[in-house]
């Protein structure tokens, strides 16, 4: 593998994980904040809010996992290898 291609693949893998974690991280923080706010306003709806929160957090976390999978492909099964 060309040295430049190898270096670019490592940088791309790091960026894939880093950038894939920024959006969901901010979204998870906002969702947890609003869920806590909603539970404080309506304690009787706690179960419904918590269930919805956990489902949405799982969907947000899947985006980070996709970034991790892209970085693993770039590091170990690099399609740009000659």
Swiss-Prot record:
Q: Provide GO CC annotations from the record.
A: plasma membrane; proton-transporting ATP synthase complex; proton-transporting two-sector ATPase complex, proton-transporting domain
Q: Which Gene3D superfamilies match?
A: F1F0 ATP synthase subunit C (1.20.20.10)
User: Transmembrane ranges?
Assistant: 6-26, 57-77
**In which family does this protein belong, per the annotation?**
Belongs to the ATPase C chain family.
Q: What is this protein called?
A: ATP synthase subunit c
Main function: F(1)F(0) ATP synthase produces ATP from ADP in the presence of a proton or sodium gradient. F-type ATPases consist of two structural domains, F(1) containing the extramembraneous catalytic core and F(0) containing the membrane proton channel, linked together by a central stalk and a peripheral stalk. During catalysis, ATP synthesis in the catalytic domain of F(1) is coupled via a rotary mechanism of the central stalk subunits to proton translocation.
Q: Which NCBIfam families match?
A: ATP_synt_c, PRK07354.1
A single Gene Ontology biological process assigned to it is: proton motive force-driven ATP synthesis
Membrane association type:
Multi-pass membrane protein
Location in the cell? Cell inner membrane
Kindly state the subunit structure of this protein: F-type ATPases have 2 components, F(1) - the catalytic core - and F(0) - the membrane proton channel. F(1) has five subunits: alpha(3), beta(3), gamma(1), delta(1), epsilon(1). F(0) has four main subunits: a(1), b(1), b'(1) and c(10-14). The alpha and beta chains form an alternating ring which encloses part of the gamma chain. F(1) is attached to F(0) by a central stalk formed by the gamma and epsilon chains, while a peripheral stalk is formed by the delta, b and b' chains.
CDD domains xref list: ATP-synt_Fo_c_ATPH
Record keywords:
ATP synthesis, Cell inner membrane, Cell membrane, CF(0), Hydrogen ion transport, Ion transport, Lipid-binding, Membrane, Transmembrane, Transmembrane helix, Transport
């Amino acid at each position: 593998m060309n040295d430049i291609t190898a270096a670019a693949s490592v940088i791309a893998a790091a960026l894939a994980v880093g950038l894939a974690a920024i959006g969901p991280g901010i979204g998870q923080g906002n969702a947890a904040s609003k869920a806590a706010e909603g539970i404080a306003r309506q304690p009787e709806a706690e179960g419904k809010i918590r269930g919805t929160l956990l489902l949405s957090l799982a969907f947000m976390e899947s985006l980070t996992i996709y970034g991790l999978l892209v970085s693993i492909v770039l590091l170990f099964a690099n399609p740009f290898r000659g």
